[in-house]
Every structure is written in C-alpha cells, then in structure tokens.
Amino acid sequence: MTLQEEITRRRTFAVIAHPDAGKTTLTEKLLLFGGAIHVAGAVKSNKIKKGATSDFMEIERQRGISVATSVMGFEYQGRKINILDTPGHEDFAEDTYRTLTAVDSVIIVIDGAKGVESQTRKLMDVCRMRQTPVIVFVNKLDRPCKDPFDLLDEIEKELRIRVRPLSFPISSGDTFKGVYNIYEKNLTLFTSDERQTADASTVEINDLASPELDEYITERYANQLREDTELVEGVYDAFDREAYLRAELAPVFFGSAVNNFGVKELLECFIRIAPSPRPAPTETRIVEPAEAKMTGFVFKIHANMDPNHRDRIAFLKICSGTFERNKNYPVSYTHLRAHET
C-alpha cells in the first residue's frame, strides 16, 4: 500500500461532550460495532460488570468519569479508525484541548434531555477556531427528551453552526422505537434493550410509505415519522459534504448509545464523509500528509498516572511521512533525539 493510499483510508477523530452526556459510552459502542471488542463495557452501571475500555485508570473506574484522553483504533470496511475519548469534566479540560490539536474531525455528544451545555460550548469554540469538522450525536433518546426540532434549533444557536439531520428519532423515552436513517433512506428498528453485544436483531424498511411500517411501530408513530422527515427535507438544505469539511455544517444523528440505537448509522456515515489526515499548519509553512519526510508533534504525555502503566508514554500525532521503529528523529527546538521505546 502506498503512502497516499494509507493516508486516504485513515480517520482520526475525538469524541467530546459535557460531563455525563454519554461520550465514553458512545466510544465503547463504536468499538463494539467496529469489531474491536466483543462485549461493550459501561462507565456506570449495576447491570454491566465490564468497565469501559477507554477508562483504563483505576481512578476512572472508581469515579465513573474519564480524567485522561484514551486512544483506540480498529479496522472497519477498509478504513483505519483512530478514536480519542476525551475527559468531559472542566477540571481536565486542558487534556481535551490538547487532544483537539491532533484530530482531523470531532463527534460532539449532546444529552437529548439537557441540550447544549456549558462545556460543549467551550469545546465547540476550539473546534471553530481550528476549523475542525464536527458531527453531532444527540444521545439518550431512550429517556424523555426535548423535541428533536427544538434541539436542532438549539444546536444551531448555541454552537453557531448550521445543522443537517442525517437521522431522526421515532419518539423518545419509554416509547422510543429507533431511528430513521435519512442519509441511507432506510429505517432500522432494534428489538432489544441494553444489549451490550452487536448482534441485536434489526428490521429494515426502505420505504416510509409502506404499510409494513405501521405494523412495526403503530400507525400513530409511523405517521409522525412521515411528517417529521417531510419537514426535515423541506426546512433543511441537502447535505453538503464540502460544507461539512469546511466546518460550516454539522450533520446530526440521534440515538441511544447504551441501547445501540443509532450508533451503527453514525459509524457507517462517518467513515464515508469524515476527512482523512489534513495538512498541518506550522509557523513557516503547511506540511502536507503525503510528504516523504516524517514530521509530527507530541500532543500528550502520560507520566505516573497508573501503577499498571509505563512511567512515561508520549502520544505523537504524525503529520507527514512514516514513523519507523528504532529510528532516531530530531526534536525541534531542543536538538535532542527521539526514538520509540
């Protein structure tokens, strides 16, 4: 595989959110659907005994929050996916801000009941400043939530970005039925609650006008879905990928990460529209990813954070070229040599 082919197939993104919006749970389910794990853990749950994969530190498992960025990767449909799960709490925001310098796109998780919260606004300001493309995932639709159209208006106003829903929920709370995939023009209904494996049975309906839809979700919810999707198509412009890549438009997905609702739809669309590694600006020039010379920067260092971890681990964002094991690289400003240990 050539360097350009390797660059094109990579997708590196961060999952960011206000505390308790479901960021780490979504990360866990993306790993599940991507085949990186076979059973999804949970941040806080009495039913699920397995802890979240990204919460590897003991303090994270004890408190049920993320306090440090975790980096995970998997192969999916020919793409190399790198996920960075970030802390949501303001006390650890510096970690998240540094992580945002190393990603090519972002998924913002929003609690459907609470809407846009303070930390989400601050993180979006950083994304806007860096012109980082964002996708919004409205989470926790299995609980009573705000009206979807009210949420879309709130996202546009509070995050100051145009939105375009690419999926739409069928009710919420106790009557939540699933999500309609506007991007793929089909409906997937999940028939299980809180399944932590990726083998939940589904029903796909490609035509909303089909009477079969009434049989699955009743005539009331079927008619409501038809009206909602018609309104979406009438109010919002067609999805423009170039506008998304310019960070001018945010695709919006709805779902419930803990119940697997809407996660696969998000992942399938993400690998199609998200950017591959982008050029990196420096003080003197723009570094293109396809340049032969290896360049990069350390965006995070773990040191003495967990007794089971190595004493120091540096996280390197490669901006161009290929990193080779057991090879020394000059470190800018310090004139030191860096090598993999």
Feature-to-residue mapping (PLM):
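Structural and coupling elements of P-loop NTPases
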Residues: 1-337
